[in-house]
Structures are given as structure tokens and as C-alpha cells.
């Protein structure tokens, strides 16, 4: 089942650094001859040591004796038109991650550590310039054929050519790849312009989705498809009703069922996803017994939407489960490619006009926390004044950053958050002053530029439940003479417009793990700003942001990493690229009483893969 945490592993590649021989050779062809000088081990930790020993039997947050059987159903919103999750085209169905596998898999109880899956051994060069994986001799595709190094090399080449932009970018860092035998594959990595090596690259290769080379013979990898694609994972697709429903069945002879990284997981015989256009309808379907579990992101629904016989008699159980992961940084994101949002003063002004305290109380029942970081709910968030490792990361750019960044903590506007209407009025006066500095004036109740063009823009949404906040935001801009309108489209249109960067403002988020890395360049880097399908929705083009984001991937200690992430966070906050909204410090989950979970909850929060069905 798909986790609600969006953990994208992405980096900005430097194609100019790729040598002429960087293309993946045919299986068995010679390459540079990749030197290795580190010991063979059972996994990789981004920083420090692995928490689990080589002989561990299961992750600590699962129940190895969990009951097998039953069905887990989810009522979800949206639609889908593809069963191929690893290309740009199409909207893939939920749950496909359980069909495909990777060489290594994450422990969700560590910031960023990987253990064996398709590969049972890994050897990393001391400077992380190369990595070797040994493929598990038992690894099998769903047709019973073995997973081989040829499949891995094929997958790399397909991702380089046709993968999502983030994957194309970081797989371009592979300078050489070779398969000395059917169970071994080696990768060497290009260095950065300053000679450093992206220390995350061995882990990113471990997380590359592996496809069957034989399956794709005669098929176009770069086309959306509703034909089930053969995988090696614990589930296969059973039935598909395009856009409406998809059902997965557990692979009875799944090759990896007894692996330490799989034991106690994927317990249901069937996973069913029923799609609804509206989340309120999906909630009613869940309450009516057409779903077994629901992650609730809407505090209003959590506060008032679950009452009914099933909850009162105990058939529905609601839980608030704490987690220690960064929550998604959700906000109203400015598309700074649009001329009206190119000026920082304009972006700052628009963030000062809304009474978010009222929104938090009235719309969210006081259950959410206002977001004031790109890494909220974690020790990665900038706080106070920069010091230590963070200050060291910022110092080289002091002359290119606002002086206030070093002497004043970043704070959200106070108006409406305890200072009452007077504070909000003061903020709006300051907002008008900033807009006037940027060349805008209120004339006859309309904010216009010198040529008489009105300040007008559209907020693009895909979920009707988001309209409440967006409409309140637009109303708060009316006293400034701004014409802001909300447009809600279906999920396919929404994703298409985001991919093509055809929007003024949108309500979206950036999600990070406890070990941010190369994906930060894809979220905020200059090169990603102009790429179709980019996650740099804001269109950020700032050399300081580029340098800080790039430095994160080469941090050698946890302390260095935290300091550099905090530095990036602080620079992004002072750039006012979004109007921050809210986040929840807990996971709110409603489930059927017949759906059970392990006693231990991992660092990143509850993992539905480890739950089971029992009377």
C-alpha cells in the first residue's frame, strides 16, 4: 500500500562531467575496472553505522508471526490511467510499489539505512565513488525466471532515457556500469566539479526500480499502459477497472517472503483500491464498510466526520499515532516564472494578508500546527539564529544573502496569530508598502502596475476540500485590490498542468526524509526549474540555494548534514517561495477493528505493510 509520505530520492546531475564511455555497456562488456576497497556488508547507512547486525531476522517494527490472509480495502480519491509508475507519462495507480522491487530496501526506523532485498550483499568504495551489488540467487520474477545483472543494467538504461526527471538526473551520475557475472553488478560515479563525490549515490542505486529485460522485449518502455507489468514483488495485479478500481493479489510463492527485510509484512491476500472523485464521498464509503483503513489529512473531517454507528459500537477505531519524521512542507506555492511573482517583495506581501490563526481554529479545529520550515516536525528545521555547522555553511554566501538572515530569526507575520485584528491591519499596511515598492498601486480599488494591468492570478487545485483555505486566502487579498481566483480540476488535468508548469499558484507540498540528499536539488535547484515534470514548482533559480543543496549530498557526518539542511531551510524561508500552511505532528488513522498493527511504531510513523487482518 502506498505510504502518504512522499520520499523522493533525487539529485541534479552534471552531464558535462560524464565521460564519453559513460553509457551502460552490454552485459559482461568491460568498463573502467571499478576498484573497491571497503568490506562486503548487508546494507548501507548514509551516515554512521547500520543499526541492525548482519544476522538480524526482522525489522523491529513488525510482528514476524503476523497472521496471513484477508483483504485490506482503501477508498481513495483521484483517478489513474497507467500501470507504469516509472515514466513521466500518465497517472499511475496506487499500490504499484508492491509489484516492483529494488536492490536494497529502507528501514523505516533509521534516518536513511538500506538493507538487502534483490541484492543480498553490497560493497561500497571507501570514498563512495563506486558500489557493487550481489544479486540474491533466489530472486525471481513472477514468471519464475531469475533476476539477473542484465535486468539491472537494462533498468538503468531505461531510467536514463525515459525515467521521471529526478531519476534521469541522478542516474546520469553513473560514469560506468558492468556485470562481470549474472549475479554481480558494479557502478562507478562521476565526481562533482569540485572533485567531491555524492555520497548518496550508492544508496540511490540501491533504490533503483528493477524491471525485467525479457518482459520489455517488443514493448515500448516509454508508453503508458494498462497491461500489468511483470515484477518481482510480493503482489501482482489481479484486476483493473481503469480510473476506478485496482486489485492486487499476494504472490503465494513470492521468492522473498522469508527475507529479514520482508518477514512480517505484506500479510493481506488482497489489496483493493476504489477511486472516488470526491474525498467526502470516499469517507462515506469507508464509514459504510467499503474500506478498512483511512489516513485522514483533513482535521475537520477528523473532528466531525466519523460519527456514526460503526464508530460508536467499536467497528471503527480512530488513532492518533506520533511520528518523528519531517512532515511535508505544505503551502500556497508561487510560480516565480510568472512575472507578477518574480519580485520577492510581492511574495512577502501576499503572505502577510491572511488571518491564519482564524483558519487554524475555524477550519482545522485547532488540530494542526502552522508550518514555519521546509522540514517541519524535525531537528532539520532552522531555528533561532544560525550557529555552528549551519553558520559555517552560510558564511561563504554572506554577501549574497539578506543581512537580516544572520541577525534576526525568521518568523511568520504576527497579524491574526494572537495580536488580533489590529495586527492584521498593520500587516496589510506593510503589504501595501511592499507592493508599492515593487511598482504596484491601488487605483479605484484595483491593484495595478504603471501600465494599468491589474494584479490577478489563479490558484490551481485538484481537491475540492482544499478550496476552503484557498478561498479564504483570496478573500484576504481583496482589501489589497488583488483579483485572485480558485480553479479546481480533476487529478489528471492537475498533474498535467503541474508537469508543464502551467499555473500561477498551487497548493502543494515538498516532502523530505530525515536524511535529505540529492532530491533537494530537484525540489529547489536552478536546473530543475525549467524541466517538465519538475518538483521545483516554485521555479527557484538561486546559486546560493544550488550550492547549499549540493553540499547536503556530500556531508560526511550527521552533524554536518543537519547544519547544511538548516542553512538551506533558512535561505528558502527568507526567499518567500510559498505562503506556508499547516502540518500535523501525528498520523490520524481510522481503521476497522479487524485490522491490527504491531506494538512498535517506527521512526517514520505507522507502516501499513506490517498490518494484518484478524477477526
Residue ranges and their predicted role:
Residues 38-127, 134, 157, 161, ...:
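N-terminal lobe/hinge region of extracytoplasmic solute-binding protein
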Residues 52, 62, 67, 87-95, ...:
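Aromatic- and charge-enriched surface segment that lines or borders ligand/interaction sites
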Residues 58, 78-94, 118, 145, ...:
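A structural "hinge/loop" feature
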Residues 76-78, 91-94, 241-246, 250, ...:
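Detector for C-terminal structural segments
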Residues 79, 99-112, 157, 204-265, ...:
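Gly/Pro-rich hinge or "lid" segments in bacterial periplasmic/extracellular proteins
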Residues 134, 169-216, 232-241, 386-400:
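Surface-exposed binding/hinge segments that line
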Residues 136, 223, 254-307, 348, ...:
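Ligand-site clamp/hinge motif
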Residues 176-177, 238-249, 274-338, 345-349, ...:
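Extracellular/periplasmic solute-recognition and catalytic clefts
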Amino acid at each position: 500500500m502506498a505510504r502518504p509520505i512522499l520520499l523522493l530520492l533525487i539529485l541534479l546531475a552534471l552531464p558535462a562531467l560524464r565521460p564519453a564511455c559513460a553509457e551502460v555497456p552490454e552485459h559482461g562488456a568491460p568498463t573502467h575496472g571499478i576498484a573497491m576497497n571497503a568490506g562486503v556488508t548487508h546494507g548501507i547507512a548514509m551516515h554512521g553505522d547500520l543499526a541492525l547486525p548482519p544476522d538480524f531476522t526482522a525489522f523491529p517494527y513488525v510482528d514476524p508471526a503476523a497472521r496471513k490472509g484477508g483483504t485490506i480495502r482503501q477508498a481513495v480519491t483521484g483517478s489513474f490511467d497507467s500501470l507504469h509508475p516509472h515514466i513521466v507519462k500518465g497517472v499511475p495507480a496506487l499500490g504499484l510499489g508492491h509489484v516492483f522491487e529494488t536492490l536494497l530496501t529502507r528501514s523505516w526506523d533509521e534516518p536513511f539505512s538500506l538493507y538487502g532485498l534483490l541484492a543480498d550483499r553490497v560493497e561500497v568504495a571507501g570514498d563512495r565513488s563506486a558500489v557493487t551489488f550481489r544479486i540474491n540467487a533466489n530472486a525471481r520474477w513472477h514468471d519464475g525466471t531469475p533476476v539477473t545483472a542484465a535486468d539491472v543494467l537494462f533498468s538503468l538504461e531505461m531510467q536514463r532515457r525515459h525515467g521521471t526527471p529526478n531519476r534521469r538526473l541522478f542516474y546520469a551520475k553513473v560514469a560506468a556500469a558492468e556485470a562481470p557475472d549474472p549475479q554481480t553488478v558494479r557502478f562507478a560515479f562521476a565526481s562533482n566539479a569540485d572533485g567531491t563525490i555524492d555520497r548518496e549515490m550508492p544508496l540511490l542505486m540501491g533504490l533503483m526500480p528493477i524491471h525485467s529485460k525479457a518482459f520489455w522485449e517488443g514493448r515500448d518502455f516509454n508508453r503508458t499502459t494498462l497491461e500489468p507489468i511483470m515484477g518481482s514483488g510480493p503482489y501482482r495485479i489481479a484486476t483493473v477497472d481503469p480510473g476506478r478500481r485496482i486489485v492486487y493479489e499476494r504472490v503465494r510463492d513470492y521468492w522473498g517472503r522469508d527475507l529479514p527485510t520482508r518477514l512480517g509484512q505484506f500479510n493481506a491476500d488482497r489489496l483493493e483500491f476504489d477511486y472516488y472523485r470526491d474525498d467526502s464521498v470516499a469517507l462515506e464509503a469507508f464509514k459504510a464498510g467499503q474500506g478498512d483503513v483511512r489516513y485522514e489529512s483533513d482535521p475537520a473531517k477528523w473532528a466531525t466526520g466519523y460519527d456514526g454507528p460503526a464508530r460508536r459500537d467499536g467497528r471503527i477505531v480512530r488513532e492518533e499515532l506520533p511520528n518523528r519524521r519531517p512532515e511535508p512542507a505544505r503551502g500556497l506555492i508561487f510560480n516565480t516564472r510568472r512575472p507578477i511573482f518574480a519580485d520577492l517583495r510581492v511574495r512577502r506581501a501576499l503572505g502577510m494578508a491572511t488571518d491564519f490563526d482564524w483558519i487554524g481554529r475555524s477550519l482545522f479545529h485547532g488540530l494542526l500546527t502552522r508550518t514555519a520550515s521546509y522540514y517541519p516536525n524535525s531537528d532539520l528545521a532552522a531555528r533561532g539564529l544560525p550557529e555552528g555547522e549551519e553558520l559555517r555553511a552560510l558564511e561563504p554566501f554572506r554577501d549574497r544573502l539578506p543581512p537580516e538572515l544572520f541577525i534576526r530569526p525568521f518568523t511568520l507575520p504576527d497579524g491574526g496569530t494572537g495580536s488580533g485584528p489590529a495586527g492584521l491591519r498593520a500587516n496589510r499596511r506593510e503589504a501595501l508598502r511592499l507592493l508599492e515598492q515593487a511598482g504596484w498601486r491601488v487605483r479605484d480599488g484595483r491593484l495595478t502596475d504603471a501600465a494599468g494591468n491589474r494584479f490577478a492570478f489563479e490558484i490551481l487545485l485538484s481537491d475540492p476540500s482544499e478550496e476552503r483555505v484557498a478561498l479564504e486566502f483570496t478573500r484576504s487579498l481583496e482589501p489589497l485590490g488583488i483579483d485572485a481566483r480558485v480553479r479546481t480540476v480533476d487529478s489528471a488535468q492537475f498533474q498535467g498542468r503541474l508537469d508543464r508548469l502551467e499555473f500561477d499558484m498551487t497548493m502543494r507540498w515538498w516532502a523530505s526524509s530525515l536524511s535529505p540528499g540529492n532530491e533537494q536539488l530537484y525540489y529547489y535547484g536552478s536546473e530543475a526549474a525549467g524541466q517538465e515534470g519538475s518538483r521545483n514548482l516554485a521555479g527557484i533559480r538561486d546559486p546560493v540555494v544550488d550550492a547549499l543543496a549540493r553540499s547536503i549530498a556530500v556531508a560526511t557526518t550527521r552533524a554536518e548534514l543537519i547544519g547544511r539542511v538548516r542553512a538551506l531551510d533558512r535561505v528558502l524561508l527568507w526567499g518567500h517561495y510559498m505562503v506556508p500552511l499547516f502540518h500535523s505532528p501525528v498520523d490520524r488513522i481510522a481503521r476497522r477493528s479487524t485490522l491490527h498493527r504491531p506494538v512498535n511504531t517506527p521512526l517514520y510513523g505507522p507502516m501499513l505493510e506490517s498490518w494484518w487482518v484478524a477477526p
